[in-house]
Amino acid sequence: MGKQKREIEYDCVARGMVRYLHIPARKARLLTNMIKGMTVREALNTLAVTPRPSAVPAIKRLLLSVVASVDRKAHPNTDDLIISKVYVDGGPMLRRIQAHAMGRAFRIRRRSCHVTLEIGE
């Protein structure tokens, strides 16, 4: 494994969370690790050209929601704010049954996740 990135502490300006997102945590982490530490403008541009269509709309909606909740008087230019922290936690699994050969049944686990995003300066 590579070296752990050292996180820089930013003052939290706004925080948002989406729960029970019907995307596996592993797929969501690929995107969130990519945009962590970027400015809001860079993150939106990166999400626009990312070839991972399953998680992009949900992460983009969350990012725009957090940007909308920023106090405009204290921070008039929201494009320069930095994504300071992003967590993706596993959510509950929906278990489904798929019929298989010789009367067997296989389990299908439909995974979900919770995503938390913080914007700082």
Please tell me what each predicted stretch does.
Residues 2-23, 29-30, 34, 38-121:
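Structured, basic alpha/beta domains of bacterial-type, RNA-associated proteins
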